[in-house]
Amino acid sequence: MGQFSILGFIALGGAIGACSRYLVSEFCVLLFGRGFPYGTLTVNVVGSFIMGLLIAAFENEILATEPWRQVIGLGFLGALTTFSTFSMDNVLLMQQGAFFKMGLNILLNVVLSISAAWIGFQLLMRS
């Protein structure tokens, strides 16, 4: 597969990931309101879980081609998950004086995202 084909597939994965992030974020606002950045937390945890699955899938040769790793890892997950939004959410919480929510957001994103990546990895490594 040529470089331009791979770039096209990465871009497609990125478009799907970005649209997914928007939809998940909007759904979280409908469910929980805007008082806490649930959308960012959700996409980061889900994306970390999928990344764990993806890495294990390559280790177990379930997905053995490099283009899939790039399309899913760089494209889809790169657009789905977001450290910049996570950072901005915390700046806004800090400006509002919501230090407890800011600390909770940081703790939940770090602990749940790392846990989700580990769980996803372990699920396929035991296969």
Curated annotation (Swiss-Prot):
Q: How does it sit in the membrane?
A: Multi-pass membrane protein
Q: So where does this one cross the membrane? A: 4-24, 38-58, 71-91, 104-124
Keyword annotations from UniProtKB, A to Z: Cell inner membrane, Cell membrane, Ion channel, Ion transport, Membrane, Metal-binding, Sodium, Transmembrane, Transmembrane helix, Transport
The GO terms describing molecular function are:
fluoride channel activity; metal ion binding
Q: Name one Pfam family in it.
A: CRCB
Q: How's its activity regulated?
A: Na(+) is not transported, but it plays an essential structural role and its presence is essential for fluoride channel function.
Q: Which domain of life is it from?
A: Bacteria
Question: Which terms in the GO cellular component ontology are assigned?
Answer: plasma membrane
- Is Cytoplasm a UniProt keyword of this protein? no
* Reactions that this protein is recorded to catalyse: fluoride(in) = fluoride(out)
Q: What does the UniProt entry say about where the protein is found?
A: Cell inner membrane
Q: Which residues bind Na(+)?
A: G78, T81
Which terms does the UniProt entry file under GO BP?
cellular detoxification of fluoride
For whether the record's keyword set contains Ion transport, the answer is yes
Q: Which family, according to the similarity comment?
A: Belongs to the fluoride channel Fluc/FEX (TC 1.A.43) family.
The cross-references to HAMAP family, in alphabetical order and at most eight, read: FluC (MF_00454)
- Protein purpose: Fluoride-specific ion channel. Important for reducing fluoride concentration in the cell, thus reducing its toxicity.
Q: Please state what the protein is called.
A: Fluoride-specific ion channel FluC
Species of origin reads Vibrio parahaemolyticus serotype O3:K6 (strain RIMD 2210633)
